[in-house]
From Swiss-Prot:
CDD domains xrefs: MPP_CapA
Record-linked InterPro entries: Capsule_synth_CapA, CW_Biosynth-Accessory, Metallo-depent_PP-like
Stated family: Belongs to the CapA family.
Pfam families with a match to the protein in the record: PGA_cap
Protein name, per record: PGA biosynthesis protein CapA
Disruption phenotype: Cells produce PGA but at a greatly reduced level.
Lineage summary: Bacteria, Bacillati, Bacillota, Bacilli, Bacillales
Coiled-coil ranges (or none): none
Length: 380
């Protein structure tokens, strides 16, 4: 009876066989083998997390970065189902009262819309909004540099589909006045969370105007009064901010200036995105600033663009605001928590905490830190 070869023995045998063939065949076969090896390795380390629930929570929230459901991601969802890409994080979302992310593409009902004058155009179908609703997302940000990739009609389709799914969208509207009205308010156990969205990067003609759909720019004349207004009606103000330089792991001066202005206006939590890579966390005057959570659902293949983070926020009965940041790896557009004590986990946490100005620790594979949020319970 022939002995069954192990995977590594098969790999060695294949490598030896390739030496007898041309260099062309070697260069084709070996990368395929390593792709397969990586797939096996990733499948082995991806684990569906066991979600802890806390009896002393008043509310729990989850924040993620860029969600792009088109291009190659759409091919994955067509083959495996749209819900499959959330299989490793769905339990976290299910356990959250509030879930937010950046919707990095317009919904288009047709394929023949006029494209914006730019190089890269992203779009997705209406099923993407439904699956986000099914995954327990409560609000998405549309203030970004791809929201108007398919013009006014693409924006109208997007706003219309979110309304059909009864899913809040911020950062864009049918006009400037409509976009300014789109402050999402959600009440959980007597605590009101407000969400707003702004973008500091966009294409020509993307900004909402008096009679034209579009996005809200990160203009202090717009965001300061809006954040101040939200602060009057909410206990916690969350600002989604699309900003920074793509593929830069360090926030620039412009991001820091905007973050401070948003904080001074009343923002409690600022969630940044657009760089497609992770940037550090900062605490400024009690405001927690995630300069960039990177991608969350995306088809970019570079290592740094696959490093991500999922933030869980727990407001405790004693007024503690507890932040738990789970390191995430993206493979085949699918985000999954990385293994505890792995090199990937340490790399992601190091990126998030470099030059940190707050006390943090690692617990159960997560980066954790506490902020005094006792003032958020005053309305209860």
């Amino acid at each position: 009876m022939k002995k069954e070869l192990s995977f590594h023995e098969k790999l060695l045998k294949l490598t030896k066989q390739q030496k007898k063939k041309t260099n062309k065949h070697v260069f084709i076969a070996i990368p395929i083998v390593f792709v397969l090896m990586f797939a096996f390795m990733w499948a082995g380390k991806a684990e569906t997390p066991k979600v802890k629930t806390y009896s002393d929570d008043v509310l729990s929230a989850s924040f993620v970065g860029d969600i792009m459901m088109g291009r190659y991601v759409e091919k994955v969802t067509e083959q495996k189902g749209a819900d499959s890409i959330f299989q490793y994080v769905e339990p976290i979302f299910r356990a959250s009262d509030y879930v937010a992310g950046n919707f990095e593409n317009p919904v288009t009902y047709q394929k023949n819309y006029k494209q914006a004058d730019k190089e890269i155009h992203l779009q997705t179908n209406k099923e993407s909004v439904k699956v986000l609703k099914d995954m327990n997302f409560t609000v998405l940000n549309s203030a970004n540099n791809h929201a108007m990739d398919y013009g006014v009609q693409g924006m109208k389709d997007t706003l219309g589909e979110f309304a059909k799914q009864n899913l809040d969208i911020v950062g864009a509207g049918y006009s400037l006045s409509d976009a300014k009205k789109k402050i999402s308010y959600q009440k959980v156990n007597g605590v009101t969370i407000a969400t707003l969205g702004f973008t500091d990067v966009s294409g020509k003609g993307f900004a909402a105007k008096k009679n034209t759909p579009g996005v809200l720019p990160a203009d202090p004349e717009i965001f300061i009064p809006m954040i101040s207004e939200a602060k009057k009606h909410a206990d916690i103000v969350v600002v989604q901010s699309h900003w920074g330089q793509e593929y830069d792991n360090d926030p620039n001066d412009r991001q820091r200036q905007l973050a401070r202005a948003m904080s001074d206006a009343g923002a409690d939590i600022i969630v940044g995105h657009h760089p497609h890579v992770l940037e550090p966390i900062e605490v400024y005057n009690g405001t927690v600033i995630f300069y960039s959570l990177g991608n969350f659902v995306f088809d970019q293949g570079w290592t740094r663009t696959r490093d991500s983070a999922l933030v869980q926020y727990h407001l405790k009965k004693n007024g503690t605001g507890r932040f738990e940041v789970t390191p995430i790896d993206i493979h085949e557009a699918t985000p999954a928590p990385v293994k505890k004590d792995s090199l990937k986990q340490k790399t992601i946490i190091r990126e998030l905490t470099k030059d940190s100005n707050f006390a943090w620790k690692v617990e159960d594979g997560k980066l954790t830190f506490d902020i005094d949020h006792s003032d958020k319970l005053k309305s209860k």
